[in-house]
């Protein structure tokens, strides 16, 4: 994936202006409400963003996003350790959608179309890398 300097700067804006843990936990909470079948993998979750199990999983998602952010030019090789987990890759896309909604809610007017496009590109790269690793 080719990144322009502007796209990288826009992804950095999102990364630097958000509380990663809170945004991801809220996105997970939204995921479990909007797409309840995704809870199949998380039988111990009550689905609320403040729940300790959701917070713990949000931390794992934040770690994966941080890894991708730190290696934005070459994400896929850094996700090799996820191989063999056998999770439905579509769930990553659904979470990415919920994350976009949460970012829009959090950043309000700062979540411009340009910012949204750059973040969407980033999340698509992450989803693609995870999907290949989990198959």
From Swiss-Prot:
GO terms classed as biological process: hydrogen peroxide catabolic process
PANTHER family with a match to the protein in the record: HEMOGLOBIN FAMILY MEMBER, HEMOGLOBIN SUBUNIT BETA-1
Gene Ontology terms, MF aspect: haptoglobin binding; heme binding; metal ion binding; organic acid binding; oxygen binding; oxygen carrier activity; peroxidase activity
Protein role: Involved in oxygen transport from gills to the various peripheral tissues.
InterPro entries: Globin (IPR000971), Globin-like_sf (IPR009050), Globin/Proto (IPR012292), Hemoglobin_oxygen_transport (IPR050056)
Other notes: This fish has three hemoglobins: Hb 1, Hb 2 and Hb 3. They all have a similar Bohr effect.
Domain Globin: 2-135
Binding partners and assembly: Hb 3 is a heterotetramer of two alpha and two beta-3 chains.
Annotated keywords: Heme, Iron, Metal-binding, Oxygen transport, Transport
Domain of life according to the entry: Eukaryota
The gene coding this protein: HBB3
Name the record gives this protein: Hemoglobin subunit beta-3
Classification of source organism: Eukaryota, Metazoa, Chordata, Craniata, Vertebrata
Gene Ontology CC terms: blood microparticle; haptoglobin-hemoglobin complex; hemoglobin complex
Membership in a protein family: Belongs to the globin family.
Tissue: Red blood cells (at protein level).
Pfam family, one: Globin
Sites where the protein binds heme b: 57, 81
């Amino acid at each position: 994936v080719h990144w322009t300097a502007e796209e990288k700067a826009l992804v950095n804006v999102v990364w630097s202006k958000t509380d990663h843990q809170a945004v991801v936990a809220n996105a997970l909470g939204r995921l479990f409400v909007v797409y309840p079948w995704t809870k199949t993998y998380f039988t111990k979750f009550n689905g609320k963003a403040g729940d300790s199990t959701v917070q713990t999983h949000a931390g794992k998602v934040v770690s994966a996003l941080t890894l991708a952010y730190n290696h934005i030019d070459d994400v896929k090789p850094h996700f090799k350790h996820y191989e063999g987990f056998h999770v439905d890759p579509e769930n990553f896309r659904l979470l990415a959608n919920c994350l976009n909604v949460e970012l829009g809610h959090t950043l309000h007017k700062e979540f411009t179309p340009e910012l949204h496009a750059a973040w969407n590109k980033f999340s698509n790269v992450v989803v693609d890398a995870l999907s290949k690793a989990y198959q």
